[in-house]
Amino acid sequence: MTIRNQRFSLLKQPIYSTLNQHLIDYPTPSNLSYWWGFGSLAGICLVIQIVTGVFLAMHYTPHVDLAFNSVEHIMRDVEGGWLLRYMHANGASMFFIVVYLHIFRGLYYASYSSPREFVWCLGVVIFLLMIVTAFIGYVLPWGQMSFWGATVITSLASAIPVVGDTIVTWLWGGFSVDNATLNRFFSLHYLLPFILVGASLLHLAALHQYGSNNPLGVHSEMDKIAFYPYFYVKDLVGWVAFAIFFSIWIFFAPNVLGHPDNYIPANPMSTPPHIVPEWYFLPIYAILRSIPDKAGGVAAIALVFISLLALPFFKEMYVRSSSFRPIYQGIFWLLLADCLLLGWIGCQPVEAPFVTIGQISSVFFFLFFAITPILGRVGRGIPKYYTDETHRTGSFWP
């Protein structure tokens, strides 16, 4: 190839060379398992949500008198509208399933540890943005659960000292959840996914600065292979499995993950017997309800994200992977069971014994983050590969 041809080659252009560096020639540890495929699946879910959301917005009307009917118009009159709506509604659930698995994989293999602190913190920010985006999106159909869910959750801001009531009034655009609230939520719901894209790109760039973690929790620059074609094929298998799983929900059980009360138009004069959020909010909602005081519940929710953000800054552990840490491994599986229990408690009535079970489960949830630094020092004697300040070398802890 001549110098002139090299200059005008597509692969030599900055954007293509960047894509080639991060998606094709990206050096990847050779022992990655299928658990490392959820990052790309999360990206696919985000693209699905944006594409379907843009088309749904073309037919949606953000007005309290027309929102519910416009959703029904999409379902009944727009060609393929039912598919767009079911893909978008169930796509949110799939997105959270993938991200929850991604988070628990990171906890199991300690992917938050040095030098990937920034990667983990960006991931927590993305998770928080997802929660906000999904919540305001749940309000848009303007059904009973949409209206009352918005009323209950936004009212939590009143627990903030001094400025709480002002924030609630600003969120509502008035003195109750009404048309101004719906318009604000629609605007934010359209904007936030694009902010999520930017945060995801930063997350990917931060990850590729130091490379991916691996099941052994060791660091090595030698035992790496190109992402394409080796791990691209492994990811492709995961994409096909995800497409099948996603299709089952869309075509055979499109409303199972939703709430039947949301097929009733919003009525400010009639409160549902039991107000519950979408299933992916239930563990956090259970923690919120486990504390009778509103301010305490809001503080507990804030502590959930503070605990996640603080994980990378605990003292460095001797061994990263839970494969070599049986004590931590047992505690991790208890945490997973605890989160599932919190999810179940979140959809139960606020009465005994569910309140007590929720309080015990919430205590264990925070206890996990409290004892993680201690467990990180257990397991001395397991080999750890580290990076010397002057040169990369393999070594073991004595």
Curated annotation (Swiss-Prot):
Single GO cellular component term: respiratory chain complex III
Keyword Cell cycle: no
Alphabetized PROSITE patterns for the sequence: CYTB_CTER (PS51003), CYTB_NTER (PS51002)
Topology in membrane: Multi-pass membrane protein
Keyword hit for Electron transport: yes
Single annotated GO MF: metal ion binding
Annotated InterPro entries: Cyt_b/b6_C, Cyt_b/b6_C_sf, Cyt_b/b6_N, Cytb/b6-like_sf, Cytochrome_b, Cytochrome_b_C_euk/bac, Cytochrome_b_N_euk/bac, Di-haem_cyt_TM
Cofactor binding notes: Binds 2 heme b groups non-covalently.
Record: residues binding a ubiquinone: 208
Protein name as annotated: Cytochrome b
Taxon lineage: Eukaryota, Viridiplantae, Streptophyta, Embryophyta, Tracheophyta
